[in-house]
Amino acid sequence: MNLQNYEYKTEPYQHQTDTLELSLDSPLFALFLEMGLGKSKILLDNAALLFEHQKISGLLIVSPKGNLPNWDVHEINKHLPDRIQRNVLVWQPNHTQRWTTAYKKMVEEDSTGVLNIFLVNVEAFATVKACKFVEEFLVTHDAMMVVDESTTIKNPKAKRTKHLIKLAPLADYRRILTGFPVTKAPLDLYSQCYFLSPNLLGFSSFFAFRARYAITQSRTMGRLSFQQITGFQRLEELQESLKDFSIRKTKTECLDLPAKVYIKRYVELSDEQKTAYGTM
């Protein structure tokens, strides 16, 4: 599978083509790209290619609740080629008859030739209810599962993290998308990479991972003793271990990006807003 005959809906920048070529048919991959570098476009082109080569029939996108409308209304319509027929369904905790009918169509009916796209907010994975519906979707599809803004699953103790990690093996392809640098919060990587595969970083537990890369000091507070993280170590080793399944790009590396455009927008303030503004 290659990009030679693939027809984009929106023309990619060079860094997007490079990233797509690198991640194209990989079962698991991490896109560590700064905000503004078009992670969603890369992901949707990747899904389109896999669908056209009959590798997937479903796409599950997990995203913060505030981002779901952007995926639903903007990103999918903008970047997914029009030639690809799709059904898009956004998770609703309170199911209407219309929603239930649309969901059943996805998981029960023959949808050959149609890419089923299920958008679920990451917060919903704290509930068993959402997990059951997602599990059914994954079981009934050859699926790509994506966690957008994957730092939302950085806490290994959180219910959402545990549930997503448990569901992950049901997906044929897995992706995480985030823009944070390793040096800023290296311990946050553990759960995100564990979602992709438990074996990626070579540690059987978060505590073993922390012992390797965190510098700690024993502290006491009353009768309570604990290990306080005071710094980090071996970060070059950690970055090296990520190279086989990820790509890291910053805006300064992407020379073909257009220049920033600043637009002035003037708004009329209400009397209440003018009063508040005057007190600043």
Model-derived features: where do they sit?
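Walker B catalytic acidic pair
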Residues: 148-149
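Conserved helicase motor
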Residues: 66, 89-100, 122-127, 154-157
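Conserved nucleic-acid-binding Ia/Ib motif block in the N-terminal RecA-like helicase ATPase lobe
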Residues: 69-111
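Conserved helix/coil segment N-terminal to the catalytic DExD/H
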Residues: 98-117, 122-141
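Inter-lobe connector of SF1/SF2 helicase motors
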Residues: 244, 248-280
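Walker A/P-loop
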Residues: 27-46
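Conserved P-loop NTPase motor "coupling/switch" region that bridges the ATPase
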Residues: 57-58, 78, 83-88, 143-144, ...
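Conserved pre-motif I regulatory segment
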Residues: 1-32
